[in-house]
Amino acid sequence: MSKRLLRSLLSLMVCMAMLLSLAPAALAESANAPSTEMAVGAVIHGFEVVENGEFTLLNAKTTVLRHQKTGATVFFLINEDTNRAFDISFVTPLSDDKGIPHVFEHSTLDGSKKYPSASLFFNLIYQTYNTYMNAATYQVMTTYPVASLSEAQLLKYADFYLDSCFNPMIYEDESLFRSEAWRYSLESADSPLTISGTVYSEMQGAASLETSASYNAMKAAFPGSHMGYNQGGEPTEIPSMTWQEVKDYHTAYYHPSNSLTTVYGAIEDPAAFLALLDEAFSPYEAKAFDFSTPDYAPVTSPVEKVCQYPVYEGTETENAAVTYITFICENATEEEQNVLDLLTMLLSDSSSALVSNLVDALPNADISVYLETDGPEPAVVFVATGMNEGDVQTLRECIYASVLEFAENGVSQDILDAIASSLTMETALMSEESDLGVNLSLIHISEPTRQAEIS
């Protein structure tokens, strides 16, 4: 998934629905025709319609609804895409490197009160009529998307996901925690005591110089915030996690008031999804959430940090360093962030002065530039590989000189036209993608209509 698609994940709340009092023939004529009973202020299965609109890029009618009892947000995008999708997402902040959100993501789909089978999730993936079924943990949220060509099947998957999220078996079965998180293993009396577990093993395999450099860079740029933590969990920290911590985390954040539900595609009976959601949400009372970062201490002067990464003896270390240079863009407005996003594209272009200057100064180095928006403040991040620790000053001078040249001379119209053409084509092809509904699981919780357009 591209960084641009992941832009702005840190808010969460708004949605839609369609009450089907229309005749089936009318629905067949237009899958996205809005019901006259979906006017703003209408209440359907405990959800109040708060916004109606259109998403022309996807040829979709949009509706945002809010659950009257809990404040949970539901977002419908109704169009003629038969690859229908359902998703529920929660803001799941990080406070350490144990990987608790990741472990719970795995444990969630290990069975629930209504579906008490640890193997059901995999049976559904491989033996039922779905086109996508998964879950994912990101820096600021955990999301549970599923897609199907059958609306009836999608409704059943939604029921499975909702019960799994709100009534997981892990509360009663510690073995699920031990299986997914970590446990001690002893193959024989003479064997050494080892640690195993699905998430522990997964994160051992995912550990790399590049990922370590990324987390260390964000920790230095945003000290005290969630940005420096590994959402998947650090293998050295995962064994300090307890079963009680995982249960407490679920109690704290898996709540309807902290959720965004998205339903996408040729949905003929939105009311059925609303009835299902109302059943899942109604046992809860409204709850306020505060995702401020009181421990965040903004940097006020340049910070330099060198981190070591262990490698096997004999590993080639020449030109093997990864360097991050990050510029915090404090209080950048949304418009300014859009400009910065375009700037990073221009600087990353193979014909840019930055790339050209770097090739001359450090022939083995590669560089990329992106706008980071998941942190407390937006930041422009330069990432260089294929260099040595002693080359940092040369890299810094290349960046400064290139940005200054860009500011003084601008960019050629040919390059602007090429990028504009590329973006236009990318946008035009978006509606042809097969996983549009699944990708919508990455939108913000606070303003889904606007965030869907950004994505």
Regions found by a protein language model. Give the residues of each.
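Short acidic-hydrophobic surface loop/beta-edge motif
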Residues: 61-69, 303-314
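Bacterial N-terminal signal peptides that target proteins for export
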Residues: 2-13
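A short, sequence-level motif marking secondary-structure junctions
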Residues: 10, 28, 77-83
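Bacterial N-terminal signal peptides
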Residues: 11-21
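Charge-rich, well-structured scaffold segments of protease-associated domains
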Residues: 32-42, 107, 111-298, 319-324, ...
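Active/ligand-binding-proximal structured segments within catalytic/core domains
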Residues: 78-120, 124, 334-347
